[in-house]
Amino acid sequence: MKKSIFITLLMIFICQSSIYAKNAEVAQKEAKYTIEQLFKEFSKEKNVTRVKLGGFAMSFADTKGVSGVEVYSFDECADNVKNNINTAIKNLDDSSYDTLVSTNEKGERTKVLVKIEKDFIKEIVVLTGGDDPALIKIKGKIKPEDVKKVVEYNQ
């Protein structure tokens, strides 16, 4: 009798643990991210390719107010990491940035966001989802007309 009660209690405990773990996983996937959280969390993933250029490196180029660039590429990461990034990009919620462009073509989601302060672009963030996700952040004190010149030059 004691053995039956013990086994029953053990089964109840296992079922509750399983339900809790599943709920925690669902909650994490549905979590809203800010830009900073997105970069901080996913920059630590295994096999991520990181490139950071700071002020010293930027001084060698005519960068039109750009003081730094960060690029994180996840094409070598595991599929579950890519899926988590794609979900995070989809659920992004950061009111301190304005959306410049948002596209979703054939499962590839791209968002271009800007943070503007006192008539200057302080940050440009490019988020790309899909099979080869990437996060790009460009920091500086950029005049909007300089961005327009670069776009026109590259057309």
Predicted regions mapped to residue ranges:
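Mature, folded catalytic cores of secreted/periplasmic enzymes
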Residues: 19-29, 86-91, 127
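Early exported N-terminus immediately downstream of N-terminal targeting peptides
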Residues: 25-85
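Short, low-complexity, Pro/Ser/Thr/Gly-rich segments in the mature regions of secreted, periplasmic
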Residues: 143-155
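Localized chelating/binding microdomains
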Residues: 64-67, 121-122, 148-151
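Surface-exposed, polar helix/loop patches in the mature regions of secreted/periplasmic/lumenal proteins
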Residues: 87-146
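Flexible, processing/modification-adjacent segments and terminal tails
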Residues: 20, 37-40, 146-149
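Bacterial Sec-dependent N-terminal signal peptides
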Residues: 1-27
